């Protein structure tokens, strides 16, 4: 089961604690880290991405490669040497040579139209502020469309196996990786 960690510094008290969580998740074998700090400047995003890449460089001697993705900003991903970008569902479809591309999808139609390398699909389960959950049957249908799908939204360690059974390549989340209670 592949794991896709989406960051939220506000939930953990800032950049310094977030870097510690990122380091811990690298040691725990996370496969992707999406830097999703939407409210910071391009300069701050650039600098934080470089800090995450430095942590990865220091930790890679001990682990398999971990892909670092920048939320919405292909320019920052390219400028920092990050591995890819995560695009929201409303972003224009584009080809970004040299970058791994994830796209948020909330409907089967969005998945069918996507040219991304991977998609996150959800919310699969109940998740605060994310609307009506799609459910496992919709996830199963999404996974049958020939895309590499990561289940998102309300996923926890107890229901992760159900997502994998539905055909997901992996699981994605914020609280899943930042909240020890999950």
Please place each PLM-identified region on the residue numbering.
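A short acidic, helix-capping loop that chelates divalent metal ions and anchors anionic groups
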Residues: 77, 125-130
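Conserved, surface-exposed functional patches that form binding/active-site neighborhoods
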Residues: 122
């Amino acid at each position: 089961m592949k794991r896709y960690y989406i960051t939220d510094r506000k939930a953990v008290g800032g950049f310094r604690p977030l870097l510690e969580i990122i380091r811990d998740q690298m040691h725990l074998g996370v496969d992707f880290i999406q830097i999703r700090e939407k409210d910071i400047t391009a300069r701050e995003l650039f600098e934080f991405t470089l800090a995450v890449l430095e942590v990865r460089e220091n930790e890679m001697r001990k682990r398999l490669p971990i892909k670092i993705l920048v939320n919405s900003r292909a320019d920052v991903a390219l400028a920092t040497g990050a591995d890819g970008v995560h695009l929201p569902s409303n972003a224009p479809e584009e080809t970004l040579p040299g970058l791994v591309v994830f796209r948020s999808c909330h409907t089967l139609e969005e998945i069918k139209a996507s040219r991304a390398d991977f998609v996150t699909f959800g919310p699969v389960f109940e998740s605060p502020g994310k609307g009506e959950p799609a459910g496992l049957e919709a996830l199963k249908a999404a996974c049958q469309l020939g895309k590499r799908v990561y289940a998102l939204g309300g996923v926890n360690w107890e229901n992760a196996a159900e997502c994998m059974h539905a055909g997901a390549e992996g699981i994605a989340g914020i609280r899943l990786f930042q909240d020890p209670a999950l």
